[in-house]
A protein has these predicted regions:
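Terminal alpha-helical segments
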Residues: 1-136
């Protein structure tokens, strides 16, 4: 594989696992008993992975991070519209780690959970459009 093929493969992999996180969030949101912290976690994970797919495509290096604003800033170094259009997605950052452990745990409301899902969908749509990838 040449470098471009490797990049394309990695982009596909990031998107594939982002899609799985988003599907898990959707299924959790549709469940009879919504486990809001888990749904929010998967929304954050999906958004993070879509943003990382863009960074890989643009060959912008990034460190291991769950911070959505940090990732948006990196994306904005190539395309400033990321910060303009997706800055509210930073609300997902707290769902990466903080709510996963007992000392910082809280249960997001159903409204917060729906907002997290909408934010993740917006990140998905925006990134896929920028990457010129068509997915439903």
């Amino acid at each position: 594989m040449d470098k471009n093929e490797i990049v394309e493969h990695l982009v596909e992999q990031w998107i594939k696992i982002a899609e799985r996180d988003l599907l898990t969030a959707k299924q959790g949101l549709e469940a009879d008993e919504v486990i809001t912290d888990t749904v929010c976690f998967h929304c954050q994970q999906a958004a993070e992975k879509y943003l990382k797919a863009f960074l890989v495509k643009k060959q912008i290096e990034f460190t291991k991070t769950h911070n959505i604003m940090s990732l948006l800033n990196l994306c904005a170094s190539d395309d400033n519209s990321f910060k303009e259009e997706l800055s509210e997605a930073d609300n997902l950052t707290d769902y990466a780690v903080e709510i996963r452990y007992p000392d910082d745990w809280y249960e997001p409301t159903i409204e917060e959970t729906k907002l997290a899902y909408e934010s993740a969908l917006k990140v998905k749509s925006f990134v896929l459009k920028k990457l010129e990838i068509s997915k439903e």
